[in-house]
Amino acid sequence: MRVGIALSGDVPGAAERVLEAVERADVDVVVYHNVELDADVEEVRAKDPGRALVEDLVEGRLDAAVRGAVSGRCVRELVDALDLPFTGRSTVLEAEGRRVLLAPVGIDEGWEVESLVKLGELAARFHRRLTRREPSVAVVSSGRLEDFGRRSEIDRWLADGELVARLLKERGMEVEHVGILVEEALERDVVLFVNGVLGNLTFRCLSLVAGFRSHGAPVLAALERGVVFVDTSRAQRASGYARALRLAAELAGG
């Protein structure tokens, strides 16, 4: 079992955080980098560590990969290499001892109802894989339902939330549109936002500010193809990278 992770000298503190994560993860890790490393680790030096990481994953030289501390451009390169319709990233957070999925967390994802419904289905399947039980789903939008009419943008997102929840219910899922009430949504297993900006902002508030433990964000569309890639923020702490490495190994069967 070989799991790759990348770091770039362009990201402040990247080497220190990633190397600490490798020590803590208890996983066989290959570090992709473009800096001088003074560490006893398996390493691949490349001009573009993120691209090299994706190439080795797609070509089967790695069992799984974690983005690590490099530009998010490598996620787009994964999408292109696998010809994916979208990434479908879903962050795995710990909330009161439970694994809760947040999706979408890519700022350019989830802006159409059809893609949100597909992402909800992918996230539900992924949660079943993690927990072996049926998930409950909360759809989060832009206000309380009684806030219709206050502003056209709010109305549109509320309407999208209602429609997504209805369509997922028609597919046999346990779903509720909770409006803007994130505090209620976190009591469910899957939290589905009506666009990726809301999802990304919520992830940053919960994980990078409030200290909720993050295990990274698997690219669910790739996982459906049998390819394990866990996205992470380049600002993540070493402990977060270590959890992402362990999740990647778990998903790859290690």
Swiss-Prot record:
Q: What class of enzyme is it?
A: transferase
Which controlled-vocabulary keywords does the entry list? Methyltransferase, Transferase
The biological processes this protein is annotated with in GO are: methylation
Q: Please tell me whether the keyword Transcription is annotated for this protein.
A: no
- InterPro entries to which the protein is assigned, alphabetical: MeTrfase_MtxX_xsu (IPR016764)
Q: Is Transferase set as a keyword in this record? A: yes
Enzyme Commission identifier(s): 2.1.1.-
- Classification via SUPFAM superfamilies: Isocitrate/Isopropylmalate dehydrogenase-like
Q: Name one GO molecular function term.
A: methyltransferase activity
The UniProt family comment states: Belongs to the MtxX family.
- The entry's protein name is Uncharacterized methyltransferase MK0941
Its organism's taxonomic lineage begins at: Archaea, Methanobacteriati, Methanobacteriota, Methanomada group, Methanopyri
